[in-house]
Swiss-Prot record:
It catalyses: N(6)-L-threonylcarbamoyladenosine(37) in tRNA + (sulfur carrier)-SH + AH2 + 2 S-adenosyl-L-methionine = 2-methylsulfanyl-N(6)-L-threonylcarbamoyladenosine(37) in tRNA + (sulfur carrier)-H + 5'-deoxyadenosine + L-methionine + A + S-adenosyl-L-homocysteine + 2 H(+). [4Fe-4S] cluster 1 binds at residues 13, 48, 79. CDD domains: Radical_SAM. Residues 4-115 form the MTTase N-terminal domain. SMART domains: Elp3. This is Probable threonylcarbamoyladenosine tRNA methylthiotransferase.
């Protein structure tokens, strides 16, 4: 496939970004040329399908590309391929498909698309996504998928139909890849999975051992640990708290609770209680006082009553996370909760607006506590509108006028918003 020009566009999570980097690496190794969309012979859209708004963005983007570039080959990759093939067939029946477990077959799909043929490469494999060719989107940040899939049974989720049951990758390969990334100049290692704390449930290994192993690599760099399900954290709470104490690990805990009501959590089949979430947060904060907490909330689950919603508001007021990700509940393909009646849309909108206001107040209050303080930041990239973007030791984003990507700087925080800090 020497000389085939390929453009890759990515939607969704950090894991999807890693998938795109792997596809780019595999394609370049086979002789493809990575380029912008206008110059491409083949366009790859790596889809996300976890939320209803993202589904619409993905579908509209596929349609727009087909209208704008009818002469180019199209490969649709990512979660949509496995979750909703009937809808994909309806909107893009002439496109080739590449499932998220089939990244090494990207050259096969691209060759077909470049020749006007349709190739459908789907289904699960046992392919390992570490120590494979990569093209980093940011040369300073290396994303390592440590495991793929989920053994959970959340009633609202469709992602597991795309990613399958959990497959943990060998710890020695993960640590070796991190070592090579640091040696090549990376300043940030991101560990990603659908649930990083579930790492090793199938192999007997633990996430805490991975973190400790990477922390022992010589060099000045940071480790960001991705989202962890509370039920998975409980299996190794002591080890994780200890691992997070390393100065190389961002003091940042992404712990989705989804609801502040135990009855709703039970209906969601989350496998944990509100008190267990509280206990995990309190344990981390007691031993790592500067840790920032991120959590996710689903607003308007079908069985969420007004009292349940107020319990969620109360929990956020109590815990005061630094990052709060809100999603309005909408049915997802193949999810069990799709058999339930959705709540009235006007009520859903009211609850969502109320939570959005609460979120902005809490996150701005938390960020304003840092105004006037001095923080060491890792500058990770140039800002789109000028300046530079860095991260504090607690992973809070900082916008600064001066800097050099890859450098560590001590800055004074002069102002704050609900989403970032401003430094001198």
């Amino acid at each position: 496939m020497d000389g085939i020009r390929v453009y890759i566009e990515t939607f969704g999570c950090t894991f999807n970004q890693a998938d795109s980097e792997i596809m780019a690496g595999v394609l370049r190794e086979e002789g493809a040329v990575l380029t912008g969309i206008d110059d491409a012979d083949v366009i790859i859209i790596n889809t996300c399908y976890v939320k209803h708004p993202t589904e619409h963005k993905v579908i509209n983007r596929i349609k727009k590309i087909q209208e704008t570039y009818p002469e180019k080959g199209l490969v649709v990759a990512g979660c949509m391929v496995e979750i909703d093939p009937s809808k994909l067939e309806a909107i893009s029946g002439d496109a080739s498909w590449l499932g998220p477990h089939q990244l090494r077959r990207a050259p096969q799909a691209v060759r077909a698309a470049s020749n006007g043929l349709v190739e459908r490469i789907t289904g699960f494999t046992s392919d390992v996504k570490v120590k494979v060719p990569r093209v980093r989107s940011n040369p300073l940040i290396h994303i390592i998928p440590i495991c793929e899939g989920c053994n959970g049974s959340c009633s609202y989720c469709c992602t597991r139909f795309a990613r399958g049951r959990i497959q943990s990758y060998p710890s020695d390969l993960i640590i070796s890849e991190a070592r090579e990334a640091v040696a090549s100049g990376c300043r940030e290692i991101q560990l990603t999975a659908q649930d990083t704390a579930a790492y090793g449930v199938d192999t007997g290994e633990k996430l805490s051992d991975i973190i400790k192993g990477i922390s022992g690599i010589p060099g000045n760099f940071r480790i960001r640990v991705g989202m962890m399900h509370p039920a998975s954290v409980l299996r190794d709470l002591d080890g994780l708290v200890e691992a997070f104490k390393s100065e190389k690990v961002y003091s940042f805990l992404h712990l989705p609770v989804q609801s502040g009501s135990d009855s709703v959590l039970a209906d969601m089949e989350r496998g944990h209680t509100v008190d267990e979430f509280r206990m995990i947060v309190e344990r981390f904060r007691s031993e790592i006082p500067d840790i920032s907490i991120a959590t996710d909330i689903i607003v308007g689950y079908p069985t969420e009553e007004r009292e349940d919603f107020m319990d969620t508001c109360s929990l956020l007021e109590e815990v005061k996370p630094s990052f709060i990700h809100l999603s309005k509940y909408r049915h997802r393909p193949r999810a069990r909760s799709s058999s339930l009646d959705e709540i009235d849309f006007r009520e859903l909108r009211r609850r969502s607006r109320a939570l959005e206001e609460l979120k902005m107040r809490i996150t701005e209050e938390e960020n304003r506590r840092l105004v006037g303080s001095f923080q060491e930041i890792l500058v990770v990239e140039r800002g789109r509108k000028g300046g530079f973007i860095g991260r504090t030791g607690s992973y809070i984003p900082v916008v600064t006028e001066t800097g050099e990507p890859g450098s560590f700087r001590r800055v004074r925080i002069r102002d704050a918003t609900g989403t970032y800090l401003l430094a001198d």
